[in-house]
Swiss-Prot record:
Role according to the record: Catalyzes the NAD-dependent oxidative cleavage of spermidine and the subsequent transfer of the butylamine moiety of spermidine to the epsilon-amino group of a specific lysine residue of the eIF-5A precursor protein to form the intermediate deoxyhypusine residue.
Necessary cofactors: NAD(+)
Record pathway: Protein modification; eIF5A hypusination
Organism domain of life: Eukaryota
Name used for this protein in its record: Deoxyhypusine synthase
Enzyme class: transferase
Record family assignment: Belongs to the deoxyhypusine synthase family.
Species: Candida glabrata (strain ATCC 2001 / BCRC 20586 / JCM 3761 / NBRC 0622 / NRRL Y-65 / CBS 138)
Cellular component terms (Gene Ontology): cytoplasm
Gene this chain is encoded by: DYS1
Reactions catalysed, as given in the entry: [eIF5A protein]-L-lysine + spermidine = [eIF5A protein]-deoxyhypusine + propane-1,3-diamine
Amino acid sequence: MSAANDKLPDILQDAVLKASVPVPDDFVQVKGIDYSAATATDMRASDLVNSMKTMGFQASSLGKACDIIDEMRSWRGKHIDELDEHDRKGQFDDAGYQKTTVFMGYTSNLISSGLRETLRYLVQHKMVDALVATAGGIEEDIIKCLAPTYLGEFSLEGKSLRDQGMNRIGNLLVPNDNYCKFEEWIVPIFDKMLEEQEEYVAKHGKDCLDANTDVDSPIWTPSKLIDRLGKEINDESSVLYWAHKNKIPIFCPAITDGSIGDMLFFHTFKASPKQIRLDIVADIRKINSMSMEASKAGMIILGGGLIKHHIANACLMRNGADYAVYINTGQEFDGSDAGARPDEAVSWGKIKAEAKSVKIYADVTIVFPLIVAATFANGKPLPKN
């Protein structure tokens, strides 16, 4: 206490002028960006994010997410030649070293938005190993190959839009004609898939019951259906196209919860009494096996709900992910899975206690392009690990 305050009552000295303990040496000072500095002019994304690490609040979480993603991408284990035959599982880099298996999940609205191009870039360049999406995240990717989505306003009146045949997704507009084009495109594919399925069943009988026995067989699973759509669309703007081309599985356990579900429903009337059958059990075995075989597992979760939990639950099968980055606006006060912080997943064994993890409370369309620019697309060699 300074001499100027030595006449204050003791209660004020104790309450208002309470002394601090010494600050530990490892404390980081809060510091923002000095835009008067020459280095701040036309700053690279990676430099901007690095400067934001000491800013506090969600800016610091964004910086931490970039560090986690860099470590997730750069980790390397043993060379495949050092491993016994039964241990040669999981993902390997081009030089033959073990690397992290990266699971990325995203909700349908992100494909409806311009984030689709960012997600496509990651799949095109094999920067992720498995995807989990909602049904809308599948169909909207295809629909955008057939017709565009437009910018609108959040405030547009629903009744007026309905009268015009315009569907609103936030401040995006999708003409209903787009879904009619989607139906015209997908029904012949369903016809062909049903024909292939029935021919295979007739030929193989009981031997065709296991969808995992022959990954190329027309015993369909949601991921096989999605792969087929990626093959058929044959459009380089599509996430599904690049996932098919690069053999990156896309899992969608709620494949019927969207326009694809409508089309499958309509197709049952056309094809009755036959119908396309999708084996969801084969897909849960596939994604859980990918997790169990991973040398290390990383999660990048864009949004919440089904896509978040499906990846986290797969990582439970290996006693937790090693890296986790969540980006969503969900709050935990209502007990929702979307709102839960990574530490809640630790309690379930879905993220390891010693894992590197962070949650960014933000709109994914704002922060994820910046994260990708600062990490996956920064043009620099991977940090050595």
